[in-house]
Amino acid sequence: MSRKLITINQVKDYVGQEVTIGAWVANKSGKGKLAFLQLRDGTAFFQAVAFKPNFIEKFGEEAGTEKFDVAKRLSQETSVYVTGIVKEDERSKFGYELDVTDLEVIGESQDYPITPKEHGTDFLMDNRHLWLRSRKQVAIQQIRNAIIYATYEFFEKNGFIKFDSPILSGNAAEDSTELFETDYFGQLAYLSQSGQLYLEAGAMALGRVFDFGPVFRAEKSKTRRHLTEFWMMDAEYSFLSHEESLDLQEAYVKALIQGVIDRAPQALETLERDVDALKRYIAEPFKRVAYDDAITLLQEHEADKDTDYEHIEHGDDFGSPHETWISNYFGVPTFVVNYPASFKAFYMKPVPGNPERVLCADLLAPEGYGEIIGGSMREDNYDALVAKMDELGMDKSEYEFYLDLRKYGSVPHGGFGIGIERMVTFVAGTKHIREAIPFPRMLHRLHP
């Protein structure tokens, strides 16, 4: 079969022309002289129509009938080369369809386990390698790709250099109780929770750096917002103030949303995402509220009939219901700033004049998606950082390189991190984070 091989998302450039598409059969229907093939190739889904008389006219009665019978017998996920004439189709959401002129089976698929009927979550997760082929799962991964692309584009435009932090580390970045341990030639090593400590070294060398890679948290959590392995973007920068950092974070999140709208509009449509809401999050300024003011707001509204969060006191950390209420109250992504030092990381710089609060921020996404970014200014004074580590009983010998950064030309600096899967979940409008990564690793889920 001689062919002009294209992908489905290219068909708009070939209206009226004969092309060939390599694809899988997602579904099929029809009767009599017609067969409707729902095709997918990773770029999009669309319909190809096989009409028996056209096959007979081209190949003769016997060969044409045999070709058409092959089309009618195609099973779900059979791979094919389909040749045909591209036509515009206003009835289709995709806008085009293919009038089939030839067909070649590449690989047959028998008894495909994920049929169009409903399946339970455990079954779908056990067959994740196949579930990824479904229309909605493809859309989610396309959104993930758009977010990753927009990440690199944003940091390139803003003068950041990609800086690769190690996955194996001899110390903890944050909470030592959530570390995966491994033997490193007789030494105890940990899988990285965050590249932040190493990025601070990068910022002292290169000014503005970012990292993007997998991180690991040994959290025994089964919520819809937690994974044990996920992909984190961490950024670190020298000479920026706290307010400038918040401006940068806001611009970054808006760039990610715009990137998805620009690069994956069909995916958003497939997922029935409210694009007008996403556009509003871009257009309107993000809200900024101090932690103590947020606590006061929660206390003032806890008796409202539509609230479902527990009472909270100043000094307490937020639970998911508190975060949901705060972001929904303001209606846009909301920065909560200046949390208590008591439950934040040791390296965060105190608020000037208020050592019980630190210069940090969590960005809470609306619609119940909760925290998507965490960031802070870092303590840049050597003596102050040593005193904090002593107060917490930390072994400073494990952080010699980190302390050195404060001894040799320390400067004001800060950074932030975003879990890409949380951002994907928010932009895609999905309910569970497990669908935001190709092969999720969660409590009790290590396969496939």
Swiss-Prot record:
Its EC number is 6.1.1.22. The keyword Protein biosynthesis applies. GO terms for cellular component: cytoplasm. CDD domains: AsnRS_cyto_like_N, AsxRS_core. InterPro entries: Aa-tRNA-synt_II, aa-tRNA-synth_II, aa-tRNA-synth_II/BPL/LPL, Asn-tRNA-ligase, Asp/Asn-tRNA-synth_IIb, NA-bd_OB-fold, NA-bd_OB_tRNA. It catalyses: tRNA(Asn) + L-asparagine + ATP = L-asparaginyl-tRNA(Asn) + AMP + diphosphate + H(+). Belongs to the class-II aminoacyl-tRNA synthetase family. This is Asparagine--tRNA ligase. It comes from Streptococcus suis (strain 98HAH33). The lineage of its organism: Bacteria, Bacillati, Bacillota, Bacilli, Lactobacillales. The gene is asnS.
